[in-house]
């Protein structure tokens, strides 16, 4: 019995030995040529649509520097190239893509080496400067990209280019909404209509015209229009008839127009007429205007007690106690005390009198007895324009020609009401637009030149504190009216 066990154990050892020997012969160990990919950035590549994306790479082989390799480049899993270096005309939609460069060994396609990265595709209109100008009595929109545009190439008349029709009326304003109220869309306002444009393609997605009123269609002739104010998603327009047409975000029509004449707060039996300067400061269900008939601020609101066509209709007004008596030239936001306050400039070209409301609330109440200052040494004139820099509390204004002046709104004594703000603008120009940059560090100055050519409008970007010219954009458009620093909006767009 023991012999049988020993015999069985012997043959088991023999079989195992033979098996190990044969198994060893089945494995064929060959070193693999490993490929290291370098030259691809960690940060996303930013590229304008229709531009060429070029990415040169360096490949290091562990065994054979002359090894034949197979290359592939992918954009969201779509193969876009089969070359070692990428040279690709980006025709893809504007959005962020996950990309990959992949290297395969021809003798074994299961062995792959790759490098992942991101590509952010912007439309030609993703980010830059949008200028609304008056070109031979017609509105025109020009755009200059600030992405990969070293020569400051300007695209003119982009509304007509993308929508195959022209704007009509007089140019009033251009603005870009925030992401919450309108999704970053662009608005172009003229006296004849307002146009809501897709922020990626500049295609018109909504039109506000004579059919956009609450009630029956009527003549559309505006002297002022903005749909988004500094502190709210409410906006509005002022018609040539002097009536206010409120506008709320995400509504495709104007709300009911303001009563004219209108009831006075606290005395519903009393009605007053008004003639507003072309500007509004909108808050929720209310707006501040300036009445040139009474020479005072008027705060328009809904009383909820007076029967009206629309629950948001302005049917009551609060008249400011402060008498100013001069037409309002403009206003802007300042940050006195860290809260929202506003500064307004008044000027009457007939009498050459000027005044400054250094700080007032959104309701028209002046902040202190010294807030209203009548300017004796001013340089305002017919055609003057103004802007407020909320970062440093300066008010800039022009003299109707090429000279700039500044008012220091934070000066407690206000000893120097008009300080020349030196800037080396050419002699043959007239300032028609002032716009403070989003970061408050620069001032965009739009000028009309006397050049005998088609596009006479230039824009200068100057240092907000010392007037040094930072950039000069020649032939930006017609006579500059308004400008917006367009920000990019990242989302996919159906085309």
Would you name each region that the model predicts?
Residues 1-9:
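Bacterial N-terminal signal peptides that target proteins for export
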